[in-house]
Curated annotation (Swiss-Prot):
Keywords: NAD, Oxidoreductase, Tricarboxylic acid cycle
Naturally occurring in which organism (per UniProt): Rickettsia canadensis (strain McKiel)
Domain of life: Bacteria
E.C. numbers: 1.1.1.37
Binding site for NAD(+): G11, S12, G13, N14, I15, G16, D35, N97, I120, T121, N122
Gene Ontology molecular function: L-lactate dehydrogenase activity; L-malate dehydrogenase (NAD+) activity
Pfam families tied to this protein: Ldh_1_C, Ldh_1_N
SUPFAM superfamilies, per database record: LDH C-terminal domain-like, NAD(P)-binding Rossmann-fold domains
Protein name stated in the entry: Malate dehydrogenase
Entry binding sites for substrate: R84, R90, N122, R153
């Protein structure tokens, strides 16, 4: 019988629990649900496995407070850390979540140095950088969940604007995973038709698309303000699963993620949201889009914001 991949989820909060549920439904692999809070991962694991009996899923889920249980993981998704509360920016979380990431990274280095790692913890672009530097893993095996989520928000708002199925919409959001992200209307399409062409056809306006771009930039903040007690978790978890599946099944999908750049887009030693190809070796390729002067200026501004945050943890 073929052995299931081992997937460890570091952090058993809302995103961690949702990830485990999705992995179980899709039967992507056996799960270790880790958390420092005693009883929480164990309780969720039991609940999820009981749900699995009705779903016909034989996936094994183990709740743990011991990092040794992640030993030999094929993939790891990190959600540990404080979530955003109303009035907090992603950047306010830096100092406390950096300490948590350093601890997580040391344990990955010790127990699962061959794993493919996806980071979700905010501020994303900084946390994924800390994981890379502290774990010693190769850069093609450490990525951040950013653009997949931002693009999903952009896709939804565009589908609503054009009154079409979300399946017909493809969009790209570049840059840092924050308010300076760069949703690219020119590279976004409805059934292959670029947004600027649809505007020329009279199906929308530049003004409406700009409003959608602003709403996309504040997509996470909008949910934080409504929830009042935390941040989004269904869409972030689903976005990470898309990335995980491309890795485990060697799908070689092009997904926008926070990837480590070494000269691409003229950027060195930074994690920035760009389109990449994810396969069984991790990041196979970085796709370099040709940007207009205006797009490049917005992208550079977003990158500069990431660079300033990184300086705070160096």
């Amino acid at each position: 019988m073929k052995k299931n991949p081992k997937i460890s989820l570091i952090g058993s909060g809302n995103i961690g629990g949702t990830l485990a549920h999705l992995i179980s439904i899709k039967e992507l692999g056996d799960i270790v649900l880790f958390d420092v809070a005693e009883g929480v991962p164990q309780g969720k694991a039991l609940d999820l496995m009981q749900a699995g009996t009705m779903l016909g899923s034989d996936i094994k889920i183990k709740g743990s407070n011991n990092y040794k249980d992640i030993e030999g993981s094929d993939a790891i998704i990190i959600t540990a850390g404080l979530p955003r509360k109303p009035g907090m920016s992603r950047d306010d979380l830096i100092s406390v979540n950096t300490k948590i990431m350093k601890d997580v990274a040391q344990n990955i280095k010790k127990y699962a140095p061959s794993a493919f790692v996806i980071v979700i913890t905010n501020p994303l672009d900084v946390m994924v950088y800390v994981i890379l530097k502290e774990s010693g893993l190769p850069h093609n095996k450490v990525i951040g969940m950013a653009g997949v989520l931002d693009s999903s928000r952009f896709n939804l708002f565009l589908a609503e604007e054009f009154k079409v199925s979300v399946n017909s919409v493809n969009s790209i959001v570049l840059g840092g995973h924050g308010e300076a992200m760069v949703p690219l209307a020119r590279y976004s399409t409805v059934s292959g038709i670029p947004i600027p062409d649809l505007i020329k056809m009279g199906l929308s306006s530049n003004e409406n698309i700009e409003k959608i771009i602003d709403r996309t930039r504040n997509g996470g903040g909008e949910i934080v303000a409504l929830l009042k007690t935390g941040s989004a978790y269904y869409a972030p978890a689903t976005s990470a699963i898309e990335m995980l599946e491309s890795y485990l099944k060697d799908k070689r999908q092009i997904l926008t993620c926070a990837a480590y750049l070494q000269g691409e887009y003229g950027i060195h030693d930074l994690y920035v949201g760009v389109p990449i190809i994810i396969g069984t070796e991790g990041v196979l390729n970085v796709i370099e889009l040709q940007l207009t002067k205006e797009e490049k200026a917005l992208f550079d501004k977003s990158v500069e914001g990431v660079r300033k945050l990184i300086e705070m943890v160096k």
